[in-house]
C-alpha cells in the first residue's frame, strides 16, 4: 500500500466521507491482501485480520 500526498493521474482518490485508504490482510498470510479500498475510520486489528491504513485519501 502506497500513500501519496500528491495526485499523479494513475493514483485513485477516495470518495467523500471515506477518506482513508486501507488494505486488509489475514494474519496467517500477510503477503496476500484480502481487500483494499476506502474507509471512513481505520479498523482495529483482530486475531484474524490485520489492517494497514493511510492517513490520506490517495493511494494505489
Curated annotation (Swiss-Prot):
The keyword Secreted applies. GO terms for cellular component: extracellular region; membrane; other organism cell membrane. Disulfide bonds join 3-21, 14-38, 42-53, 54-59. Keywords: Cardiotoxin, Cytolysis, Disulfide bond, Membrane, Secreted, Target cell membrane, Target membrane, Toxin. Expressed by the venom gland. Its main location: secreted. Monomer in solution; Homodimer and oligomer in the presence of negatively charged lipids forming a pore with a size ranging between 20 and 30 Angstroms. Belongs to the three-finger toxin family. Short-chain subfamily. Type IA cytotoxin sub-subfamily. This is Cytotoxin 1. It comes from Naja kaouthia (Monocled cobra).
